[in-house]
Regions:
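Hydrophobic/aromatic residues positioned on beta-strands within the core alpha/beta folds
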Residues: 81-83
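His-Asp phosphorelay/catalytic-motif detector in bacterial-type signaling
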Residues: 46, 72-79
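Acidic di-acidic motifs
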Residues: 8-9, 51, 85
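Two-component/phosphorelay signaling modules centered on CheY-like receiver
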Residues: 11-29
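Acidic, metal-coordinating helix/loop segments flanking the phosphotransfer/catalytic sites
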Residues: 29-47, 55
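Alpha4 helix (beta4-alpha4-beta5 surface) of REC/receiver domains from two-component response regulators
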Residues: 85-102
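C-terminal output helix
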Residues: 106-115
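Conserved phosphotransfer microenvironments
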Residues: 50-67
């Protein structure tokens, strides 16, 4: 079972994503802030799904950059999906090293399919 860390400061969103991904066979650690995400991250983490906007002026890009710079326990090439309701964030997320950008709202099955595709390649 792939290990996924989902980060969104909206508790309802993070719980919904956790439920949907677990139904599709993923092991999910649901986090509402960067500190929790860092605590759940380890070398067995296969992917991250991170909301762009997080609480306290934090951004999903902060976690993405930390992963890519080797500042977390995850491997530097761990798959990272950034999501946002603002399409203008896509280029910045991809330039920072995100594997994919998901524009919210997206169909419930799209995330699972994308994760399966990223993890199989």
């Amino acid at each position: 079972m792939p290990n996924i860390v989902v980060v969104d400061d909206d508790i309802t969103n993070v719980q919904l994503l956790q439920m949907l991904l677990e139904l599709d066979g993923f092991t999910v650690h649901a986090c509402t802030n960067l500190e929790q995400a860092m605590a759940f991250t380890n070398a067995a983490t296969n992917a991250f799904v991170v909301d762009w906007h997080l609480e306290r002026n934090a951004s999903g890009l902060d976690l993405l950059r930390a992963i890519r710079q080797g500042e977390t326990a995850a491997k530097k090439d761990t798959a990272v999906i950034i999501s946002s309701g603002d399409h203008r964030r896509e280029q910045e997320a991809l330039a920072a090293g995100a594997n994919h950008f998901l524009l919210k709202p997206y169909p419930p099955d799209e995330l699972s399919k994308l994760l399966a595709s990223l993890l199989s390649s």
